[in-house]
């Protein structure tokens, strides 16, 4: 696909799709009304996220040359300037659309558009603060959808907390996966600072916290059989399998496998949250 394929790759469409699902999840768990605001709300997060991915690749070009030489910039398929232009264009488009949703939504979108620049240029190299910002961005897709629907619910707040801890786990595992390039360029990730073994223990503890948060909606009877089946019974064992790899001290050699397990767990968990309002029992 050439240049167009590189543009698509740098925007990471799979992540963009997840942001749409997150926004939709926040909406359907807050209201039963489906109108034009829903379409608008689902368009904005992927625009901002794709912009963030582009600026991230812009500043990560040298590191990616070691860790991921197949990425669009180090492979020479697009230039750094083109990546910067993508960030600017998509950010401005997302901010412009948010004006039609309301002032709070406009502030959130503007804040995250600027935050992704700050993350790519400075925060990513600080380790945990950068990981926390990325995870907050994932969690806020649900909150954004709920706010756009006009009714931020307790259930969505719990769901967004689960999204935050789950993604933080994935960020820590990715830090282990990217360890060679990060060490070479002085990036102070959690894995560089405390080592792979301690990072694995931290991932396990965060997994336990995620389990507790995931079960809370069931305890408070906020959810039904779909959430229980997908988000609890199926998703959580996969997460704990990934965390068991970390606890056994095998994270460094199985980082990619662990990351894949976490992504599957996150998707199933989110799917349960999304479909739960449509339960029949």
Swiss-Prot record:
<keyword id="KW-0444">Lipid biosynthesis</keyword>
<keyword id="KW-0472">Membrane</keyword>
<dbReference type="InterPro" id="IPR050475">
    <property type="entry name" value="Prenyltransferase_related"/>
</dbReference>
<dbReference type="GO" id="GO:0005886">
    <property type="term" value="C:plasma membrane"/>
</dbReference>
<feature type="transmembrane region" description="Helical">
    <location>
        <begin position="225"/>
        <end position="245"/>
    </location>
</feature>
<comment type="similarity">
    <text>Belongs to the UbiA prenyltransferase family. DGGGP synthase subfamily.</text>
</comment>
<feature type="transmembrane region" description="Helical">
    <location>
        <begin position="200"/>
        <end position="220"/>
    </location>
</feature>
<keyword id="KW-1003">Cell membrane</keyword>
<keyword id="KW-0594">Phospholipid biosynthesis</keyword>
<dbReference type="InterPro" id="IPR000537">
    <property type="entry name" value="UbiA_prenyltransferase"/>
</dbReference>
<keyword id="KW-1133">Transmembrane helix</keyword>
<dbReference type="GO" id="GO:0047295">
    <property type="term" value="F:geranylgeranylglycerol-phosphate geranylgeranyltransferase activity"/>
</dbReference>
<dbReference type="GO" id="GO:0046474">
    <property type="term" value="P:glycerophospholipid biosynthetic process"/>
</dbReference>
<keyword id="KW-0812">Transmembrane</keyword>
<protein>
    <recommendedName>
        <fullName>Digeranylgeranylglyceryl phosphate synthase</fullName>
        <ecNumber>2.5.1.42</ecNumber>
    </recommendedName>
</protein>
<keyword id="KW-0443">Lipid metabolism</keyword>
<dbReference type="InterPro" id="IPR023547">
    <property type="entry name" value="DGGGP_synth"/>
</dbReference>
<keyword id="KW-0808">Transferase</keyword>
<dbReference type="InterPro" id="IPR044878">
    <property type="entry name" value="UbiA_sf"/>
</dbReference>
<keyword id="KW-0460">Magnesium</keyword>
<keyword id="KW-1208">Phospholipid metabolism</keyword>
<feature type="transmembrane region" description="Helical">
    <location>
        <begin position="88"/>
        <end position="108"/>
    </location>
</feature>
<feature type="transmembrane region" description="Helical">
    <location>
        <begin position="132"/>
        <end position="152"/>
    </location>
</feature>
<comment type="pathway">
    <text>Membrane lipid metabolism; glycerophospholipid metabolism.</text>
</comment>
<dbReference type="Pfam" id="PF01040">
    <property type="entry name" value="UbiA"/>
</dbReference>
<comment type="function">
    <text>Prenyltransferase that catalyzes the transfer of the geranylgeranyl moiety of geranylgeranyl diphosphate (GGPP) to the C2 hydroxyl of (S)-3-O-geranylgeranylglyceryl phosphate (GGGP). This reaction is the second ether-bond-formation step in the biosynthesis of archaeal membrane lipids.</text>
</comment>
<dbReference type="GO" id="GO:0000287">
    <property type="term" value="F:magnesium ion binding"/>
</dbReference>
<feature type="transmembrane region" description="Helical">
    <location>
        <begin position="261"/>
        <end position="281"/>
    </location>
</feature>
